[in-house]
Amino acid sequence: FTTNRNLNEMEFSMKSVKGLLFIIASFILTLLTWMNTSPQFMIPGLALTSLSLTFILATRLPLLESWFHGLEKVYTVHKFTAFLSIILLIFHNFSMGGLWGSRLAAQFGNLAIYIFASIILVAYLGKYIQYEAWRWIHRLVYLAYILGLFHIYMIMGNRLLTFNLLSFLVGSYALLGLLAGFYIIFLY
């Protein structure tokens, strides 16, 4: 016995294979890279990848739209990666505590998490807020992303500033996320 909803979910997954493979491959690559270099940072590493993907998915790029078979489906995955990001960040915040890095790095990280959590709350309250106000508040996530990048690079230091697979992966996702965020905020 199959319902319409089950059929729609199957249709989403069957038509969106390229897009879903892109997301899954990004997470697998992230997991494998962090497992082989600094396994204790896998959770925040996945959070960075997820946040970067969230920005990339919000760009409305025609390529992504074709991979997911429609903008609506791209935004469904965008919401999922945003939610996954905040869950991973909260888990990271509780599991790492104040164990690593400087006090300033920790403050950047905490501030970023508070901004992310606030914006997720605003996103879910969006239907009660005028669209223009919601859109500008939602853009503050870019500030949180930048603070999070400062946090990461202050904590990881030389591991991310020397050329290796980890620095290439983190740098690539960070740069793609920054470029996507800039594009979203300033160019459309």
Which residue ranges define each predicted feature?
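Membrane-embedded alpha-helical bundles that constitute the cytochrome b-like, heme-associated redox core
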Residues: 7-188
